[in-house]
């Protein structure tokens, strides 16, 4: 009697990274189970997939966690009080431009791209998760602008909410433009232009 071969196995960690890249590139709704299984390799069956990851939604959430663990520090400078507020905003935008435009991974931001298509995902949990992540980035810009006002770098009349939204809009826009193929060299110059929004609100020096 022929000996039964061993069942095919797969590297779960590598499979998670592959899933992260697929979701990053195509979003939650547009990434199919067949695409995920093919990317994972090892001839993984549907039962094996569900045994390993429970569901597509659970896998997406885990992939987001992986993404944040690898790339989620882009906005940390916004909350670092030891960094000058203007410098913190500049660092965040520069880092985002470089990461979104370069590297051996899909272009753009997985969270920003996912948030724009979250309404069609059919999952309220995923929509809320992505919106929460986006909200934290927006809150970071707001906190940075508030520090600028408190430290006397920006005029007291500065509308912190509006300026924060302007920077957050540019931050999210970098992701879209990176996916459209705008090169980092161009984006880096655009970041310099965007910082003009901060400079326009700078408190005039006294004579």
Predicted regions and their residues:
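N-terminal intrinsically disordered/low-complexity leader segments
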Residues: 1-10, 204-207
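Amphipathic C-terminal alpha-helical segment
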Residues: 99-103, 147, 167-185, 197-206
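Helix-turn-helix
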Residues: 2, 14, 22-58, 62
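Amphipathic alpha-helical segments used for helix-helix packing
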Residues: 88-89, 102-125, 176
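Hydrophobic alpha-helical connector segments
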Residues: 62, 76-107, 160-167
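An amphipathic alpha-helix adjacent to DNA-recognition modules
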Residues: 12-17, 29, 51-79, 90-97, ...
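Amphipathic alpha-helical packing segments from all-alpha helical-bundle domains
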Residues: 69-72, 87-91, 106, 123-150, ...
